[in-house]
Amino acid sequence: MEGTAGTITSNEWSSPTSPEGSTASGGSQALDKPIDNDAEGVWSPDIEQSFQEALAIYPPCGRRKIILSDEGKMYGRNELIARYIKLRTGKTRTRKQVSSHIQVLARRKAREIQAKLKDQAAKDKALQSMAAMSSAQIISATAFHSSMALARGPGRPAVSGFWQGALPGQAGTSHDVKPFSQQTYAVQPPLPLPGFESPAGPAPSPSAPPAPPWQGRSVASSKLWMLEFSAFLEQQQDPDTYNKHLFVHIGQSSPSYSDPYLEAVDIRQIYDKFPEKKGGLKDLFERGPSNAFFLVKFWADLNTNIEDEGSSFYGVSSQYESPENMIITCSTKVCSFGKQVVEKVETEYARYENGHYSYRIHRSPLCEYMINFIHKLKHLPEKYMMNSVLENFTILQVVTNRDTQETLLCIAYVFEVSASEHGAQHHIYRLVKE
C-alpha cells in the first residue's frame, strides 16, 4: 500500500543540556625543468603542504597513468604531484624530486614503525609487509593501515592513529583518508564481507539469492540504502531562480558486482570522537547489526560566493531506499570533542516506487548552532586552522525502524576542508571491530 511521505515528529534541534594558488600552467616539459633558486629550499613549508595535499588527492596507482577528465591527458602520479605543486605554489619540482622525496618519507615512516613495535614477531611481519609495498604505498596511510592491520593480527593496537597526519607535527592535516573513491586505483581491494558475498562464487540456492550489489559497496545495510545526502546553502534570487552551494554531498550511484567492496576502519579508532553513553557509537555497534555501520570522511567545500542574507537557507536533504515498508526515525547528533551538542530527530513514512520503498528528508533546516559554526569556520584565515577545529567536530546519524528500534544505518561523519577546486569530496568506509 502506498504511504504518504512526510514528517510526523518535530524537526527542531535540541540540546542535551538546554536550549589560492597560482594559475600558471605547465605540462610535462615544465615539470622537468631545473629547480627554481628559491631561498626556502627544495621542500619549503608551502611546497610540503602542497605535496601532502597532492598525496591525498592522487592515490598510488603503480605504473598506470591517470587521465584528467578536464584535459584528457594521461599523467603518472609523480607527474601529477609535481604539477599540483607548480599550480599551488608557482615553484617547479621535477618528477624525480617527487619520487626521491616519497622514498625519503617512506624510509622515515618505516623506521618509526619499527621503533614502535616491541614484539619481534609483529616487527618481522611488518617488515615483510613493507617489503612488498612501494614507497608510495607506505606513505599512503590508507594502504599502509590495511597492510599493518594484517601484520598486527587480532588484538594488537594500531601502529599509528587514524587521526595522525602523514608527517609528525603537521598541524591540521589528516591525509590518511583518500578524498576520492577511485576504484580503478584501489591500493588493496578489501575482502568480501560476511553476508555480502559476490555471486561469482558457487551458485546460490533459490532460498538464498545473492545480496544486491549496493550492499558492501555503498552506505547500505540489508534493510536500508542511503541514495543521497547533502548539506547546502540556498538563496532565492527571484521566484524561479535559486543559487545553491553544496558544502558536502554524497551523490546517487549504481554500484555493480564488479566494483570493489568498501575499505574497513576499526571502529575503536573513532570511539573518542562520539558520545560513549547509552545510544552512543560503541553501544549501538555492540547491539548491531554490524553491517549497518559506516564512516564517511567529507572534504567540505566552504568556497562560496553566495551572500549570507536574510533570504539564505541552510539545509540538509537525504534519500533512502528499502525493500521493506516501515516508518523510519533519523537522529542526527552534532558532537564537539566527543560530546553531544545538539540533536535533531525526524520520522518519515515510506513511499512505494518501482517495486521498493523510498524515504526522503527534504530541505531539513540546519540548526542555529551549525549555521554559526559554519560562519566562524569560513572566517578563519587558513585551511589548516579550519582543519584543526574540524578535527574535534563530528556528526553521528542513526536511522532506526521506529516500531522495532532496530538500527538500519549508523553513519559517523568526520570532516576536513576541501583543498580542491572541484568542490566537496568524500570517502566511505565500513566500520568493523578487528
UniProtKB/Swiss-Prot annotation:
Q: Example GO biological process term?
A: DNA-templated transcription
The GO molecular function terms of this record are: DNA-binding transcription activator activity, RNA polymerase II-specific; DNA-binding transcription factor activity; DNA-binding transcription factor activity, RNA polymerase II-specific; RNA polymerase II cis-regulatory region sequence-specific DNA binding
Q: Where in the cell is it found?
A: Nucleus
List the GO terms this entry assigns under cellular component, sorted alphabetically: chromatin; cytoplasm; nucleoplasm; nucleus; protein-DNA complex; transcription regulator complex
Q: Where is this region: Disordered?
A: 1-42, 188-215
Q: Provide the alphabetized UniProt keywords.
A: Activator, DNA-binding, Nucleus, Transcription, Transcription regulation
Which tissues carry this protein? Answer: Preferentially expressed in skeletal muscle. Lower levels in pancreas, placenta, and heart.
- Changing residue 429 to A: what effect? Important loss of interaction with YAP1 and complete loss of transforming ability
Q: What would changing residue 380 to A do, according to UniProt?
A: Reduced transforming ability
Q: Which residues bind DNA?
A: 36-112
What effect on the protein does mutating residue 299 to A have, as reported in its record? Important loss of interaction with YAP1 and complete loss of transforming ability
Q: Domain of life of the organism in this record?
A: Eukaryota
Ranges of Pro residues compositional bias? 201-213
**Main site of residence?**
nucleus
**Feature: compositional bias, Polar residues:** 1-28
Functionally, this protein is described as follows: Transcription factor which plays a key role in the Hippo signaling pathway, a pathway involved in organ size control and tumor suppression by restricting proliferation and promoting apoptosis. The core of this pathway is composed of a kinase cascade wherein MST1/MST2, in complex with its regulatory protein SAV1, phosphorylates and activates LATS1/2 in complex with its regulatory protein MOB1, which in turn phosphorylates and inactivates YAP1 oncoprotein and WWTR1/TAZ.
> What is the protein's quaternary organization?
Interacts with YAP1 and WWTR1/TAZ.
Protein name, UniProt field: Transcriptional enhancer factor TEF-3
Recorded source organism is Homo sapiens
What gene makes this protein? TEAD4
